[in-house]
């Protein structure tokens, strides 16, 4: 009976293997690193690169956007060190390395032509930084509620985020930590990743990100990357002055189409973007408000979102 109990516990705490330990997973190898990717649509259609949130998230929660494959070759990739991409030395996980990886993905799927790109949350931060560094590589860009783009919004983000938190939010973590001894380890990162994945999949309804009564679906995320979060965002949450990047640098050189999509319910939604980010963006930027929606409208309101995106990409 004890053996059966252990088996049941292990099954409930299994952590999905990365491409390093599961040869059946699709990947693209670029400069010696295997990024987990899933693509949808005809390869001859215009490529659309989808950049997920985090840092430390994965692309699974954005798969409802695969309906855009009717008109695009849609590329979802898990960023280095998170999702189902292999784990790496945490010191190599930086904002700049994330931008360099994005450049690898764009060059691989762009076939020497400008691509279309969509970034959500942290992914929106990366896209905005990328537009300033490589404006010629993108024809159409969509950014969805980037939390931090410069030192000013870093301070605002952290202040507002902490104001929305309660010590009760940390209680589930203890339960997850107590479960970690039962987790099998192959790459040495499963236990911390398990705790973070469970926290991300708690689907807490309402604020600070969603509308009242609204929550992400169960198991929206496949596997979090704790080191990515711990190395890139946690230091900023502890001390916002640690964020010294200016992701708006050279943004005026981007001449392509640009859509900012933000919600009415999220604490970094429409009003936040208008106050901290929109004044710095190019004149051609369109700002679309998702009324009665929250931060994850791409997942929870996929039909509306894809309709707006299709219109923008026309």
Please give the residue ranges for each predicted region.
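Alpha/beta-hydrolase fold catalytic core
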Residues: 2-47, 71-72, 314
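Conserved HGGG/HGGXW glycine-rich cap/lid loop of the alpha/beta-hydrolase fold
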Residues: 33-87
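Active-site loop/oxyanion-hole signature of alpha/beta-hydrolase fold enzymes
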Residues: 82-118
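Conserved hydrolase catalytic core segment
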Residues: 113-157
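Flexible "cap/lid" loop of the alpha/beta hydrolase fold
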Residues: 143-184
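Alpha/beta-hydrolase
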Residues: 174-261
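Conserved loop-alpha-helix segment in the C-terminal half of the alpha/beta-hydrolase fold
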Residues: 250-255, 259-290
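Catalytic histidine-centered segment of alpha/beta-hydrolase-like enzymes
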Residues: 293-302
